[in-house]
Design a protein with these regions (language model features):
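Ubiquitin-like/PB1-type beta-grasp interaction modules and other compact soluble beta-rich domains
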Residues: 1-86
């Protein structure tokens, strides 16, 4: 999983973390155990992905695949992309 700069403090400074899981949902469950602060940055208290956070699997948005049930295989890359806004 690729972790963007603004969220790296929540992953112990790591730009990439290896998370063994068979689905995107499994990745988030493992993140909750290993990196709870990173999980809270991605998901709300109900476990849903926050509206301003986009998750991609191999450069394809999860909503264009199977959502959190998107299957993952060896070598797949999950990218976290939080929305940026300003005024």
């Amino acid at each position: 999983m690729e972790v963007p700069g603004p969220l790296r403090a929540a992953s112990g400074g790591a730009a990439r973390v290896s998370v063994p899981a068979k689905t995107l949902r499994g990745v988030l469950e493992e993140l909750e155990r290993r990196y709870p602060a990173l999980h809270r940055s991605i998901c709300d208290e109900t476990g849903k992905v926050r509206p301003h956070v986009n998750l991609f699997v191999n450069q394809q948005h999860m909503r264009d695949r199977e959502g959190l049930d998107t299957a993952l295989g060896p070598g797949d890359v999950v990218i976290i992309l939080p929305a940026v806004s300003g005024g």
